[in-house]
């Protein structure tokens, strides 16, 4: 935007005129309170004079018009890339960033007052908020060499403290001679005068004049390095750094948000007056690094400024270079309609088969479109897709989740048996220094706008209730220690669980196999069930695949070929469309795809991030895609009416819409097509069939929740025993049993089958054509004991 002109090299190439010198001298105490007087020949003064000349040019009028007035606080966002051609400014920012930014603020102060016909004292200090500054630095590289340097870091907000006033300047009055001494506290370090400087008065007692205090809003945040970043090291505790926010920067972020912080690296003495002797002297030399924030950029700032990308589910400031955009364009152009299959097989290539399960997880990675996320007058509709994989041990469920967390631009992987309720949602911790309570984000909040993979989901039954709100309302409400707040948790939950007993029992429902409530299970858009059944041909291919992975001597297709491992079946035609067609289309062919090479993880991560940031597909009404989804949903509702329960609700229709939007996002399309709807129906049919089929292969929609026939039989037998005690008899007719089943709301399709199973098990005995005796009743037992006497 600007060029050097006559100031190539160091600042001070032009002489300072009298008007500029007088103006800078008037505002200088506001920006440099620690300096006793304005020195026109000083380095900072000469830099400020050059900046006054620069900002007086017509090119700078657009920049100065962006001065933000937030009450008594004025700030000016400045894009560093617009000043990158001015070497004298970049050198000044590199040598002494604090001095350069204050000089820039003083220069802007003069120009703004002149352009608005204001007196220099009519406006307060203007803070320069420099953003888009060079390349971000990994937290592991932030060491002593960067002290007093200007850096940019990215991370997830882990903790936010309360806003407090910080004293910058205060007058003290001597108790003996009543002389007033102004004191300036650099970096907020409170340092009262030691002794009175008046001759003849050596008093050491001073009274702070609190009415003269100059205050500033102050807040501390802690950011943590991104878990999915390229610089992240496995097995190491994630690095964190404290950031100090002041004035207009306070309350600009909440726990769980991804922020880009530009600031000056500073050090603070970690000395605490504890212990004694050698330990005390050793602690005096310890320092820790922290950032004095100059600017903070996050999704909330972008959304407030009208940027729709932040509100549409972006992963937050994912930078795309020209090479990245060229790769995305060429990849889409080269594969065309086959992009979904290419991405699906690039995701977790070490797992053999499971095409439809991988398809569901891939759609969850791309996600749907969130509606009404910014409008406060409407209820937000979530766009994130939740999926759970249930099955026997050893089928690769954990590897699928780890692969999803690895390729996601923002993914977090946790294990259920080591996760607490607070660690999953949000915790309230007490700061040891200030004794204040603050929020500390858990896994769901840290995975905001990303993926949260929860393994061993069945081992954390106590924490299931904490997920109900986070999965549907996309937020976590907390009311602890006097703090009441709601934190965003716009994340897709991918869960993996082992059934009770180690083996999935088709005779039981999904709820009974997992010990999961029906309310939580209904929040999952997709439920996949993997069964381990012996198959000679399939086992041979799986063993070949595993050996090829370990030997590393196979061809490119040997280690990456896919053959479906889920047993095939033939669902009834009235249940829905055939679901083997999509699996066969997604499967790699040994001949046609022998040269298939998976997409590398970093490139796949870039593609997913671009799709979520810039592609927002919609379903138009009327359209073939909308008609197809509506017809499938109405058919499911019609079939579920015949069952005792009604598990097919509007949530299934919303799930279909989200999946269809995610399928369109994979192909970078803005409109959902009929082919997208058909593929989504195939995946949904797979999920519904696995969830609702019983041990005989019969589809029963009531099995998606509630109790199995075994539990219903126990409930019916318990009711019979109670009736024996109440009515003083142990024989019942079939009509009486039918009436009893209605009274206890027994949810079975065939009561005769339940009665027959109880008869075969010996709990009841048939005494006639329609008469049964309850053998297990206490009434029958007491009668037998009396007759024996």
UniProtKB/Swiss-Prot annotation:
Residues 339-546 form the MCM domain. Its EC number is 3.6.4.12. It comes from the Eukaryota. Keywords: ATP-binding, DNA damage, DNA repair, DNA-binding, Helicase, Hydrolase, Meiosis, Metal-binding, Nucleotide-binding, Nucleus, Zinc, Zinc-finger. Its main location: nucleus. It catalyses: ATP + H2O = ADP + phosphate + H(+). A zinc finger (C4-type) spans 174-201. SUPFAM superfamilies: Nucleic acid-binding proteins, P-loop containing nucleoside triphosphate hydrolases. It is an enzyme of class 3 (hydrolase). Belongs to the MCM family. This is Probable DNA helicase MCM8. It comes from Oryza sativa subsp. indica. The gene is MCM8.
